[in-house]
From Swiss-Prot:
Lineage of source species: Eukaryota, Viridiplantae, Streptophyta, Embryophyta, Tracheophyta
One GO term (biological process): methylation
Top-level taxon in the UniProt lineage: Eukaryota
Coiled coil: none
Name of the encoding gene: AAMT1I
Native organism: Zea mays
Family to which this protein belongs: Belongs to the methyltransferase superfamily. Type-7 methyltransferase family. SABATH subfamily.
Name of the molecule in the record: Inactive anthranilate O-methyltransferase 1
Signal peptide: none
């Protein structure tokens, strides 16, 4: 069955050992790193707008515990702001309406179960005057759909958030279909022709521009966006950390082709719908459109192995780290890979991938480059 983004682009479902729920520590660490940026943007909404009902949307929410961590954090920031700035009573706090958005293939059933647990936990605090006085009323809804389309009415959202999503494209470049690969790569490499590399870059420019235009229509005046996603540290498109990460996956798939477990034709037609941009590329599009004021942009790094918190250049156990990296990537890539090559290869593929990552980490400790962008809807004078 051919891969379809709307159907197949979602994280591994359920609560099993290979699920996204059990393997989303990198995203959790990124959320911790961008906490101050989220707080600044949320406070800006509170200070300049503070509506009776604040609408907050998490785009590409997935289904793990990080989604509810975001809800909890925004609620905490708003409650703290209202207490410090206004000393508001509970009945004067703004109501919070959260929309959790992802593609229809997302594990919304698991997400709704987490929401139910969250609501029950919040209910247990009712009757505790000290806690309840600080807790704004909070309502949470799921919203299936692509954020590369309009998903909200005009000027209805106060704060947009997205974590580890905007490296995903709406599709792999259309012009790559039917082209003959000189190599069996699935993402940008130095062996790829300049014209093919340019197609990946153009797809990013098209998608990111569309995303910003859509959100501009949906944000209220003064509304904020905090976007955190995988990028690269350098302007050179061939030096990105993602090139190594996905290059090792391509090598693992090639080895399965050699073993007769994967059809060569299927690998020849497979490209990842991904592009990891530089800060310069992101800034250029924001400035070119002129729809948003840029509050903040920065790059931070996270070790490939989410359980390696060390800051040095040495990997203490490359085999264990290789397995950890493979689990994280499988939780993200499994549905896409399975739709193209079949589920039966998954265990063997990611076993081979773990081995190759371990060998890579023996020679070079590699980190994800993560971009954080905070922008505000600009007032355009006609």
């Amino acid at each position: 069955m051919p891969m379809r983004i709307e159907r197949d682009l979602h994280m591994a479902i359920g609560n099993g050992e290979t699920s996204y729920t059990k393997n989303s520590r990198i995203q959790e660490k990124a959320m911790f790193q961008m906490k101050s940026v989220l707080e600044e943007a949320t406070r800006a909404v509170c200070t300049t707008l503070l509506p009776q009902t604040m609408v907050v949307a998490d785009l590409g929410c997935s289904s793990g515990p990080n989604t509810l961590r975001f809800v909890t954090e925004v609620t905490r920031i708003i409650a703290h702001h209202c207490k410090l700035e206004h000393n508001r009573r509970h009945d004067h706090l703004p109501q919070l309406q959260f929309f959790l958005n992802d593609l229809p293939g997302n594990d919304f059933n698991n997400l709704f179960q987490l929401i139910e647990q969250f609501n029950k936990s919040s209910t247990t605090h009712k009757g505790d005057a000290a806690t309840e006085a600080l807790q704004p009323p909070c309502y949470i809804s799921g919203l299936p759909g692509s954020y590369y389309t309009r998903i909200f009415s005009s000027e209805s959202v106060h704060l947009f958030h997205s974590l580890f999503c905007l490296q995903w494209r709406s599709q792999a470049p259309e012009q790559l279909k039917g082209t003959q690969k000189s190599c069996l790569d699935i993402y940008i490499t130095k062996a790829m022709s300049p014209s093919m590399v340019k197609l990946f870059q153009q797809q990013f420019q098209k998608d990111f521009s569309l995303f910003l235009r859509l959100r501009y229509e949906e944000l209220v005046s003064g509304g904020q966006m905090v976007l955190t996603f995988i990028g690269r540290k350098h302007e050179d498109v061939f030096t990105g950390e993602s090139n190594h990460l996905y290059g090792l996956l391509a090598q693992s798939l090639k080895s399965l082709v050699d073993e007769g477990l994967v059809e060569k034709e299927k690998l020849e037609s497979f490209y990842l719908p991904i592009y990891s941009p530089s800060v310069g590329e992101v800034e250029a599009i924001v400035k070119q459109l002129g729809l948003f004021n840029m509050n903040h942009v920065k790059v931070f790094e996270i070790n490939w192995d989410p359980y390696d918190d060390s800051e040095g250049d040495d990997v203490h156990n490359s085999i264990e780290s290789g397995e950890n990296v493979a689990k994280c990537l499988r939780a993200v890539m499994e549905p896409l890979v399975a739709s193209q090559f079949g589920e039966r290869i998954l265990d063997e593929l990611f076993k081979e991938y773990a081995r190759r990552v371990a060998k890579h980490l023996e020679n070079e400790k590699t980190k994800h480059a993560v971009l954080v962008l905070s922008i505000e809807k600009a007032i355009i004078h006609v």
